[in-house]
Amino acid sequence: MHELSITEELLKTIVAKAEEAKARNVSRINLVIGEYAGVVEDSVKMCFEILSQDTIANGAVLEFSRIPAKFRCRLCGHTFPSGQNLLVCPECQGWNAEVIAGNEFFIESIEVDDESQSS
């Protein structure tokens, strides 16, 4: 399960950014996952719950947004979404398409409670 190593790196980044901002704790993390990123949301959530214990991210809510896959035909340049004929260009029927969106996986935002806020 590669989600474990992905989540470990994700947590390192989140904790580092939160500490840099002098946060008291992390309350929400907004993640973006491309349709073809190969990342399973439930696995990331499970790994995050376990790995974030005893960190300032413990109890933070993970929110996921999806980016649909998009392709560009290398033969005619037409761009198109994924569909029934996965990599077949609907314009020229060519089979030589490249993925131009949908492989992404990144942190969109981190919501924190800072030290200046009262309990």
Curated annotation (Swiss-Prot):
Keyword Isomerase among UniProt keywords: no
Keywords in alphabetical order: Metal-binding, Nickel, Zinc
One annotated GO molecular function: nickel cation binding
Positions of Ni(2+) binding: 2
Annotated GO biological process: protein maturation; protein modification process
Claim: Zinc is one of the keywords in the record: yes
InterPro entries: Hydgase_Ni_incorp_HypA/HybF_CS, HypA/HybF
Annotated binding of Zn(2+), by residue: 73, 76, 89, 92
HAMAP family reported for this sequence: HypA_HybF
Protein purpose: Involved in the maturation of [NiFe] hydrogenases. Required for nickel insertion into the metal center of the hydrogenase.
Family statement drawn from the similarity comment of this UniProt entry: Belongs to the HypA/HybF family.
Name of the protein in question: Hydrogenase maturation factor HypA
Native organism: Dehalococcoides mccartyi (strain CBDB1)
